[in-house]
Amino acid sequence: MPGRLQRSAALAFALAVSIACGESERGPRTVGSDRAGSPVRVATAAGGGSPAARLYVWAGDVDRADSDFLAVLDADPASPGYGSVLTTVPVGRRGTHPHHTEHRLPAGAILFANGFMPGTTFRFDLTDPDEPRLLGSFGEAAGFTWPHSYERLPGGHVLATFQGTGPDNADPGGLVEIDDAGSVVRSASAADPAAPRALLRPYSLAIVPDLDRVVVTSYDMGEDMGMRGGRRGRTHVVQVWRLSDLAVIATIDLPLQPGGGGDEQPGEPRVLADGRTVLVSTFTCGLYRITGLASGYPGAEPVHRFDGGGCAVPVVRGRFWIQSVPNAHAVVALDVSEPAEPVEVSRLELGARSFPHWLAIDEGSHRIVVADRGDGEERIHVVLLDPATGALALDMRFRDPGSDRPGVSFERAEWPHGATGPARPHGSVFGPGPR
């Protein structure tokens, strides 16, 4: 019954929003209503703060003839230019396959961004939001190669996953702590003598300072990209590390979901609002809770299975887990108040041309940026989360100037840095405006 009431409240929110904004029934919609749109105002997050005024989008030139770049968009919901592209920062390299950035803009405003194909991390200085600078880039770190994901430690350094070692990208990879200048602080291998056959390709991570733990997923992105070197294949393990000395505590084989499957290609771990519970989503749409995380014998249990057959990047806000499900063309919200029994409360379908992949949340409001997987339309959207019910609705005001469609298209001929043609957006992060 609680799940039914939550879903009803979410659908009521979406219906009220759609009536206010009048989006066509043929456009994106929240399941259970005929229409979806965005509220007239953007609610600020609990605990104070203001909505972000800038959105940084890491993008790759589609035909690889010109430089990849970081785009800066007007994300101030009170601005008449909301959704406009303000400036761009070319990195002077093409075909890098711009991939993950950090999920939140760090306090020091130095952003790490991944160009996966050459195994490169780019560092951007965003202290002046409207005049960002490329500080430089680096490849290997402490012998580890092909970096993927970045999370900030309590002291401000980055803890990064690296998929492999050496120029051939051989497994296992590892974790590397890096300062804002790109210098190595410490590092450790993902090798585990207790799991000699496990394919250990560190992909993403969740840091749990209260428990002195790091949860690390293993997924071989290089296999999907056609890379050679080391062992390749589909993975099904998650590791628990001790944060204080970067030691592997356990390598966990994910169990099958009820009915089979869902355990392969572990993707993204996230810490819930209590600061101690970690859920892990897989690219095969399983959702798992890490059990016994504070102990020396952690495990994993299946708690949910998304439909669609392919899942991607989640975010957490309060008691809600928001998941991109590209194969269902949808973003889905779960109530995870009871982590062992998540309840779906809302679903926003973005249409057949959308394969939502990357999500990141505005810490000063309840807005979520959505970037496509790369095989759909080159467009980013902003989705609004109702913090009381978990209802999701499309922000209809976030659009190209003069456009009759929500979202900002990256399928354009001109950019501030030149006529370089369409670009493919991926990692995106909200940030403040000029002071």
Indicate residue ranges for each PLM-predicted region.
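Loop/turn-rich, solvent-exposed surfaces of beta-rich toroidal or solenoidal domains
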Residues: 307-383
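Asp-box/WD-like beta-propeller blade repeats and closely related beta-sheet repeat scaffolds
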Residues: 126, 131-209, 218
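Short, conserved, GDST-rich strand-edge loop motifs in beta-rich repeat architectures
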Residues: 50, 57-64, 160-173, 216-235, ...
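Blade-loop segments of beta-propeller domains
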Residues: 83-152
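Beta-propeller domains
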Residues: 200, 205-332
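Beta-rich, blade/repeat-based domains predominating
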Residues: 46, 92-106, 141-153, 195-212, ...
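Short loop/turn segments immediately following beta-strands, especially the blade-tip
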Residues: 72-81, 123-132, 180-183, 240-247, ...
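Blade-level signature of beta-propeller repeat domains, shared across WD40, Kelch, NHL, RCC1
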Residues: 366-367, 371-435
